[in-house]
Swiss-Prot record:
ATP binds at residues 11-15, 257, 302, 401. Involved in the catabolism of L-rhamnose (6-deoxy-L-mannose). Catalyzes the transfer of the gamma-phosphate group from ATP to the 1-hydroxyl group of L-rhamnulose to yield L-rhamnulose 1-phosphate. GO terms for cellular component: cytosol. Pfam families: FGGY_C (PF02782), FGGY_N (PF00370). It is an enzyme of class 2 (transferase). Its EC number is 2.7.1.5. Coiled coil: none annotated. The active site is at residue 235. It catalyses: L-rhamnulose + ATP = L-rhamnulose 1-phosphate + ADP + H(+). This is Rhamnulokinase. GO terms for molecular function: ATP binding; glycerol kinase activity; rhamnulokinase activity. The keyword Lipid metabolism does not apply. Substrate binds at residues 79, 234-236, 294.
Amino acid sequence: MKHYVAVDIGASSGRLILGKLVDEKLQLEEIHRFKNGFTYRDGHERWEIDQLMQEIFIGLEKVKQLGISECVLGIDTWGVDYVLIGASGEKLADPISYRDKRTLNAVQNLTSEYPREYIYKKTGIQFMELNTLYQLYVEERDLLERAEKILLIPDYIGYVLTGVKVAETTNSSTTQMLNLREQLFDKDLLSHLNIDVEKFAPLTDAGTYLGKVKEEWLEKYDIPNCDVVTVATHDTASAVVGTPAEGENWAFLSSGTWSLIGMELSAPINNEAAFKENYTNEWGAYGTYRFLKNIMGLWIVQEIARMDDYKHSFAEMAEEASNYPYFKQIINVNDARFNNPENMVDEIKLYCQETGQTIPETIGELTNCVYGSLALYYALELEKMTEITGKKIEKLYIVGGGSNVAMLNQLTAKLAGIEVFAGPSEATAIGNLVVQMINQGEIESMRAGRKIIRNSFEIGEFSCGDVRFEEIKERFTKVLEFN
């Protein structure tokens, strides 16, 4: 029996999940979990990438302690951030977080030189200041000139483990630098940044064998002999693979620090309507596209908890929130002011004050406000998606950590007026494992993998119901105008 390890690292935590296929069912075991985050060093918010590598080795040593001497391994992480590699293969600096303030106004500055419509037609990717395109636009020229290669985070981890440099396509598409038509890094865009296309590794599809873990790591650490497979390395791409969907008329919501809501399509949509609504066409596994909108997610709730010194668990916060009427206050969760404020609680209160709403005071009121606002935003985006794609959405599959928030799931079902299916919460790691198993011949296809997922995990169901959607939508429109 083959053993598979998913290295799944998000913006706030990481984990190593051991998986195996037994009687057409996936069995998972969490082997190691660790915290992740950025710290302010050398003038920027930076990821502790060396510490992440150490945590991976600690996790693999725990796998070996289970008596497993050989395994298959795949890596997924958050998107857009990168590591600059020098001529000798060394890391030139710790990677800067997408939440760093260096890209403020970068979209405006670059698009004043290079029209938005032109960039969108080429790439089909939504405009966000965190995109790699804008990070490289403001990157230190000296570092860029010294860099032989630019590797996104999961590709860098794979490189450290195996010595092989690739640019996996699902994650590379989030950079806003891939040409949809040519299926390559766009030389024209890169030349505008004075970056040679050769600084990027060869584009590689999800499901491709990468290589074996280097001997030096086997000698330094007591870890299994691992075959590394390049999975869908963008965590959302893996989460969509791990979605237990069936049929055609469905949408997905990968709910975590970010909310990524969209549809899986066979072809991109980069027309005027998609451009106007700032939708993105991220590449998916096995020739698919993730037509989606990137929305703020549970980050806001996480920050409320932090400002409260974690006196309440997230379950307790949701319980407190249920004591208040919904939609008493509505915030635009995608407003840039909520991206990384000094104090999230103060920012929410100030927003409500500025927009003529009552100010939420308690932890329950604040949480109620955020969950209600998120659900409303999801419903509005599903409505827009239907208009742009012409496809009727009958079901929404919510996966990731947010699938455990029953209040948010039920509010979404009611506002959107469709059935909501919630779970599994570890869809990203599951999608990571499924791609590995397809590579190894244990699972036939992504469709077959999704059937196995449905048979392996409990999926929650939330029915739609009557709610004052149009009235609430009108109130939200007025809030936006006020703001």
